[in-house]
Amino acid sequence: MLEVNILDKKWYSIVEDPKGFTLNIINASLKELKIDQYKPNISIALADDNLLHQLNLRFRQMNKPTNVLSFPCEQLSSECDLGDIAISIDTVRKESDEYHIPIPAHVAHMLVHGLLHLLGYDHQKKGEEVVMKNLEGKILASLGYNMCAI
């Protein structure tokens, strides 16, 4: 089951139906990854800088907001609790302006990025980063988006 919690009304200024948009991106990504049959449980918080700052400080000891955080729970299996994703509308909006990326495309990128972290992908090392970025690009292309420059 996919759960989407809209914690900031600013999300409605991005897309008319933030929950539907989020569900479509995650479901299409799971299908593109050929793992939709597992029907994983994922909770997604569409939040703001305040919450992402708190979470980033608590779990990563970084005293600043960030665009997306992922909290893996279980490894992929049938109906597993895959984990949680939180995205800040404020940081995503700033990055979209800075890099001239349409906001919905950047939100899609952050959702895919967060999902890949739940699945165990990382970008701490160069080789891992290349694998993750290539997979992000493939998924985003399947959704009709160009790979964003972040």
UniProtKB/Swiss-Prot annotation:
Its EC number is 3.1.-.-. GO terms for biological process: rRNA processing. It comes from the Bacteria. Its main location: cytoplasm. PROSITE patterns: UPF0054. Zn(2+) binds at residues 113, 117, 123. Keywords: Cytoplasm, Endonuclease, Hydrolase, Metal-binding, Nuclease, Ribosome biogenesis, rRNA processing, Zinc. It is found in: Cytoplasm. Its cofactor is Zn(2+). GO terms for cellular component: cytoplasm. Transmembrane segments: none annotated. Belongs to the endoribonuclease YbeY family. This is Endoribonuclease YbeY. It comes from Wolbachia sp. subsp. Brugia malayi (strain TRS). The lineage of its organism: Bacteria, Pseudomonadati, Pseudomonadota, Alphaproteobacteria, Rickettsiales. The gene is ybeY.
